[in-house]
Amino acid sequence: EGGEVKRLTTEPGGHGCAVAPDGATFVDTFSSRERAAVTTLRRTDGGEVIATLHEEPDMAATAQGLRPPELRVMEAADGIPMFGALYRPEGEGPHPLVVSVYGGPHAQRVLDDWALTVDLRAQYLAQAGFLVLAVDNRGSANRGLAFEAHLHRRMGTIEVDDQVAAVEQVVAEGLADPERVGIYGWSYGGYMTCMSLMRAPEVFRVGVAGAPVVDWDGYDTGYTERYMSTPEDNPDGYRDGAVTTHVEGLSGKLLLVHGMVDENVHFRHTARLITALTAAQKPYDIQIFPEERHMPRDAAGLEYMERRLVSYFEEHLLA
C-alpha cells in the first residue's frame, strides 16, 4: 500500500542495496569520491549497522595519491541543469581541455562514487597537464523521462550542443584554452566524439573515437528504434544522426580505434566511416585490434591503447 519514504543510509556517496527475503535486513554497499566501497549489513527498521562485511583499509583518495574530481552543476544548451565532473591539473589555467564523453541513454557517468575518482584515464590525463571534463548531457539516465526524451528521433544533435555548452562554460571561467580542446569516448562516446569533431569543429580540435556507431541503420534495432523509430518513419533523423553525413565538417585530428571482432558495434561502422573519409579526402588516423571485441581486454592491448590515446592528445594539444 505504500507509505512515507524514510532514508535509512546517511553516509555521503552512492548506495546500492540488496534486501533479505524476510525484509528485516539489507546489505548496503556505498562509496564516494573520497573513499572506496564499504559493504555493511543493516536493519531495515532504522538502518542500524549490524556488521561491516567488507572495507578496504587505507583506500581514501588522498592515501592513493588521487585528487577526486570536482562535481558541478552546468547548463545545457537550452539552460536546464546538467551534472559535470572536473579533473584539474596542477597550476593555474587556462589549460588544454579534454572532454571525456559517453552521452547516450542508459548511462549516468557523473556520480559521487569511487569509480569517478579511480577513472585512471582521466587521472592520467590530468597528471599530464590536461583539464578533463565529463558531463551527463540531455538524454542520459536517472534524470527522468523528460530529460531522456530530448534525444527522441534526433540522436547526435542535442547531445553535441550540450557538450559544446559545457566547454564554453569552463572556457569562460578561464580554466580551459579554447584553442586546445579535445574529446574522447567509446561506443556511443565514440559516436559522440566523431559528431562533435564534425558538427562543432570550431570547438573540438582533436578526438579519439573508440568503437563508434557511424550509422544508426547499422546498429541494434531493439536499442535504436526505441529512440529513433525506423528509418522509414524517421528518415531525416537517421540522415542527420549519421556520422557519414557530416564528414565534410571534419577539420581536426581524428584517431579511430576499433576491435575487428566487435560483437556490439560491428567493425563495419568504422569501415563505412573510412570509406566516407576517403571519398571526402579527409585525413584520419586509425588503431585496429584484429583479435579484440568491443574494447581491448588483453593487458598488452589495454596498455598500448592508453599510451596511444594520451600521446595523441599530447602531440596535438600540448606541442
Which ranges hold each PLM region?
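Blade-edge beta-strand/turn elements of extracellular beta-propeller
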Residues: 3-10
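Serine-hydrolase catalytic core recognition
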Residues: 9, 16-319
